[in-house]
């Protein structure tokens, strides 16, 4: 792991350790943003670039394999956000090549995780692929990350803070040392974000900003690496996955995940009557208001979704292999729908297994 201000300019020898013919994989916009930073460190190598188009999809991966074959690539360098990093990691895994990731924003922890998500060509989540190891190298250059819109860091905070709310549930009562350590790291990560996020957003490039970038990109990634599948996703990411099947309105991954945390807490509150979940949800609502994270479907521009679309999203979130079933109680699509439309409800508002009507959906938010 290499991190710091301007570190990409000095990373040429590190990239050269991975190979002499790198294929640089990213999206059109991320390649445009990153290549000025990569030009100098890659000057002594025989480099080609390949764009993954819109999503890390099976069709995109086929094209990337062809590009790697044409170039006789011996390593992969992946600059970009979550989907670009996932594509680079998965391509490297499938071709058995080393990979270096270069995050262009702090929107996700994908640069340091042993996991890639695969989407349809229309952006709907299909499945994830657990990778046997983390990337060989991650280069986090604060100068490059600082070129990303503020919104990406806000989304990264939403994605990172989910680590606590999901890992504390998915880990159960595990006594394994690494899982215990990962859960405690997730709690510390949450506290850091509560304490420093507002100041970080007010002073881009400052000390707090760098600390929050480290938290969102690096610390969040370490938690999944230490804890494995038992410290990853639960309902918050399941809700994200469901929403990708009904809306492609430009909402960022971390924004949907942040909203999904509220849905998860609402499910805990409505089902077992978890008072702590109700308190946590109210705390997050205040935090989200401060940062500009979405608190409801309306905040994501999804208030016009039909009941059928909400049903589809909830059904996807509850499919048999969904991480939502890591909750310590069973849930069904009707309960998920009820939680999705009541994320801003007062603490202790009633809910349960009773199916909700169209009228309730329309008037809930």
What positions do the PLM features span?
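Short glycine/serine/threonine-rich phosphate/pyrophosphate-binding segments
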Residues: 8, 31-35, 83-89, 108-112, ...
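C-terminal charged capping/lid subdomain of soluble metabolic enzymes
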Residues: 275-365
């Amino acid at each position: 792991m290499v991190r710091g201000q301007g570190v990409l300019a000095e990373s040429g020898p590190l990239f050269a350790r991975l190979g002499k013919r790198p294929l640089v994989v990213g999206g059109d916009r991320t390649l445009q943003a990153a290549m000025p930073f990569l030009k100098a460190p890659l000057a002594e190598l025989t480099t080609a670039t390949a764009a993954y188009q819109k999503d890390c999809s099976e069709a995109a991966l086929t094209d990337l394999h062809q590009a790697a074959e044409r170039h006789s690539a011996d390593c992969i360098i992946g600059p970009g956000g979550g989907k670009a990093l996932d594509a680079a990691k998965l391509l490297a895994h499938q071709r058995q090549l080393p990979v270096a990731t270069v995050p262009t924003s702090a929107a996700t922890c994908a640069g340091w995780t042993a996991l890639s998500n695969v989407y349809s060509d229309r952006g709907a989540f299909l499945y994830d692929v657990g990778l046997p190891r983390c990337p060989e190298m991650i280069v986090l250059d604060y100068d490059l990350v600082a070129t990303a819109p503020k919104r990406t860091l806000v989304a990264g905070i939403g994605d990172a803070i989910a680590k606590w709310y999901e890992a504390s549930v998915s880990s159960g009562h595990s006594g394994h040392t690494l899982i215990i350590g990962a859960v405690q790291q997730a709690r510390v990560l949450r506290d850091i974000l509560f304490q420093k996020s507002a100041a970080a957003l007010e002073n881009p490039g400052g000390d707090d900003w760098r600390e929050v970038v480290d938290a969102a990109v690096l610390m969040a990634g370490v938690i999944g690496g230490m804890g494995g599948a038992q410290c990853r996703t639960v309902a918050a990411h399941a809700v994200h996955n469901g929403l990708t099947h009904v809306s492609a309105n430009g909402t960022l991954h971390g924004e949907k995940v942040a909203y999904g945390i509220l849905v998860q807490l609402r499910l805990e509150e409505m089902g077992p009557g978890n008072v702590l979940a109700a308190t946590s949800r109210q705390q997050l609502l205040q935090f989200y208001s401060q940062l500009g994270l979405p608190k409801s479907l309306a905040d994501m521009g999804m208030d016009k979704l039909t009941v059928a679309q909400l049903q589809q999203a909830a059904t996807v979130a509850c499919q048999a292999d969904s991480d939502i079933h890591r909750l310590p109680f069973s849930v069904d699509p009707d309960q998920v729908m009820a939680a999705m439309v009541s994320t801003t409800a007062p603490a202790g508002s009633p809910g349960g297994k009773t199916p909700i009507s169209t009228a309730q959906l329309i008037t809930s938010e």
